[in-house]
From Swiss-Prot:
Reactions it catalyzes: (6R)-10-formyltetrahydrofolate + 5-amino-1-(5-phospho-beta-D-ribosyl)imidazole-4-carboxamide = 5-formamido-1-(5-phospho-D-ribosyl)imidazole-4-carboxamide + (6S)-5,6,7,8-tetrahydrofolate; IMP + H2O = 5-formamido-1-(5-phospho-D-ribosyl)imidazole-4-carboxamide
Name by which UniProt lists this protein: Bifunctional purine biosynthesis protein PurH
Protein's pathway: Purine metabolism; IMP biosynthesis via de novo pathway; 5-formamido-1-(5-phospho-D-ribosyl)imidazole-4-carboxamide from 5-amino-1-(5-phospho-D-ribosyl)imidazole-4-carboxamide (10-formyl THF route): step 1/1; Purine metabolism; IMP biosynthesis via de novo pathway; IMP from 5-formamido-1-(5-phospho-D-ribosyl)imidazole-4-carboxamide: step 1/1
Organism of provenance: Chromobacterium violaceum (strain ATCC 12472 / DSM 30191 / JCM 1249 / CCUG 213 / NBRC 12614 / NCIMB 9131 / NCTC 9757 / MK)
Entry's family note: Belongs to the PurH family.
GO MF assignments: IMP cyclohydrolase activity; phosphoribosylaminoimidazolecarboxamide formyltransferase activity
Domain notes: The IMP cyclohydrolase activity resides in the N-terminal region.
Gene Ontology CC terms, in alphabetical order: cytosol
Record key words, sorted: Hydrolase, Multifunctional enzyme, Purine biosynthesis, Transferase
Length: 525
């Protein structure tokens, strides 16, 4: 193992770097540094040699050239096991650099600002940093490359335990992380530049929503026993910077390892329950809600959601948007479930659920956030779209019927509309008093989804008198309205936009139904 005797430290993210440098110095490591990093370390009283003094060549061109020098890169790239390299380095007065600690200019943060000019973006493209990172990573057998401040404590511990040396395996892991770091950095630059309006070479160019070259990087969280089916291999990857409050932030408190289907269903349940301001419970089966309700507390919300479809809830995923207490867990564990999700659980609740060792229990921070893009693979390519995060307010709704909805109906219509967004198309949702009363999902014809929702309500013994209906897309014919009217439902919310809208509107008036248009469609496939 190579003993670390000289380190070059030059970082944009200075979190923890002072303590790291102090520990290296205490181990007798000679520190080289540049710019703001050197200033920080010197002001802290650490012995530091500026790279310009080490190379005998000043920083120049507004800092664009700092470390691009043979004495730096020769010291990083030289192989200690090749006599020719050792002799050449000695001939030219090039000393070994055994550790490189570098992270890069904050390019992504810079271009995230909509007012960022092309000039600002270009000036935040790091040149010397990635060059040193790649050089050190290439020569990982002899040089340690540190790009992540989270690694500082463990590296210091290993250096102290091994007389200032890092194991070969450690250096290799650091090199893999380094190349991942530079790949993501270059990908971000490519994404930005290829998103600029064609022909614009200055100022603040207009950006297109989707770059001509889409670079994305994900980190593997876990391998899975299998995928959607046992004959399929699978793994779960997260974004480098996952959306706030997303499934990628889950903390598993107990239970078996999450499966591919568990994560897909848990994501559907969690994204749905997060959209409600009131205390809510969502039960999901095969990525479709089979019961949703709001209530004064989690127990009430669960009982109402479960009552929608007790059969489909078997083996489902249950999500809450409030902390879960012991009484709720007592009720929930009375059914067979795969996953239970909430922002938190009381200690009493955890003790009760612990008896159900196979139940997977997840805590996820209740925060707002959405993926920048949604990706769907197709043969030979990928479909990319922005996420469906559109909600409608009262002021956006348009009543097109003679009958106006009552205040309670309007409240239920907005509730049903939120639920419908998370049901696979064609989606029909019946609701009453903040509870789903019947859900028809995934049918090829809208009227069939309507009939299924009606049958589900009948099977559950739920009265549809005074209930409302939501449709994720327009009614292409009046038949869906007629079936809804047969159930005694007197208010419907839907996007509108069919070529037969007038026929549909007339059917609503014929049945005395209040018909509300959103102007927004929520297809989900």
């Amino acid at each position: 193992m190579t003993k670390i005797e000289r380190a070059l430290i030059s970082v944009s993210d200075k979190n923890g770097v002072l303590e790291f440098a102090r520990e290296l110095s205490a181990l007798g490591v000679h520190i080289l540094s540049t710019g703001g990093t050197a200033k920080l370390l010197l002001e802290a009283g650490l012995p530091v040699t500026e790279v310009s003094d080490y190379t005998g060549f000043p920083e120049m061109l507004d800092g664009r050239v700092k470390t691009l020098h043979p004495k730096v890169h020769g010291g990083i790239l030289g192989r200690r096991d090749l006599p020719e390299h050792v002799a050449t380095m000695a001939e030219h007065g090039i000393g070994n650099i055994d550790l490189v600690c570098v992270n890069l200019y904050p390019f992504e943060a810079t271009v995230a600002n909509p007012d960022c000019s092309l000039e600002d973006a270009i000036e935040n493209i790091d040149i010397g940093g990635p060059t040193m990172v790649r050089s050190a990573a290439k020569n990982w057998a002899h040089v340690a490359i540190v790009t992540d401040s989270a690694d500082y404590p463990a590296l210091v511990g290993e250096l102290k335990a091994n007389g200032g040396r890092l194991a070969k395996a450690t250096r290799f892991e650091l090199a893999k992380k380094a190349f991942t770091h530079t790949a993501a950095y270059d990908g971000a630059i490519s994404n930005y530049l290829t998103s600029l309006a064609e022909g614009v070479v200055a100022g603040k160019p207009e950006r297109v929503a989707f770059p001509n070259r889409l670079n994305a990087q994900f980190i593997k969280v876990q391998d899975m026993r299998y995928g959607e089916n046992p004959h399929q291999a699978a793994a779960f990857y997260r974004d480098l910077d996952p959306a706030a409050g997303s499934i990628a932030h889950y903390k598993q408190l107990q239970g078996k390892e999450l499966s591919y289907n568990n994560i897909a269903d848990a994501d559907a349940a969690w994204e749905a329950v997060k959209t409600f301001e009131q205390t809510a419970c969502v039960i999901v089966k095969h990525a479709n809600p089979c019961g949703v309700a709001v209530g004064p507390d989690t127990l009430s919300a669960y009982k109402l959601a479960f009552a929608t479809d007790t059969t489909s809830a078997f083996g489902g995923i249950i999500a809450f948007n409030r902390p879960v207490d012991a009484a709720t867990v007592e009720a929930v564990t009375g059914q067979f479930l795969e996953v239970l999700i909430a922002p938190s659980f009381t200690e009493e609740a955890k003790a009760i659920i612990a008896a159900k060792k196979n139940v997977r229990v997840l805590e996820i921070p209740l925060e707002s956030g959405a993926n920048r893009f949604e990706l769907k693979r197709v043969g030979g390519g990928v479909l990319v779209q922005t996420p469906d995060i559109r909600n409608v307010g009262l002021d956006e709704l348009r009543v097109v019927s003679k009958r106006q909805p009552t205040p309670q109906e309007m409240s239920d219509l907005l509730f049903a509309w939120r639920v419908a967004k998370f049901v696979k198309s064609n989606a029909i949702v019946f609701c009453k008093d903040g509870q789903t009363a019947g859900i028809g999902a995934g049918q090829m014809s809208r009227v069939d989804s309507t009939r299924i929702a009606a049958r589900k309500a009948q099977d559950a013994g739920l009265s549809l008198a005074g209930a409302v209906a939501a449709s994720d897309a327009f009614f292409p014919f009046r038949d869906g309205i007629d079936v809804i009217a047969e159930q005694g439902i007197k208010a419907i919310i839907q996007p509108g936009g069919s070529m037969r809208d007038e026929e549909v509107f007339a059917a609503a008036d014929e049945h005395g139904i209040a018909l509300v248009l959103t102007g927004v469609r929520h297809f989900r496939h």
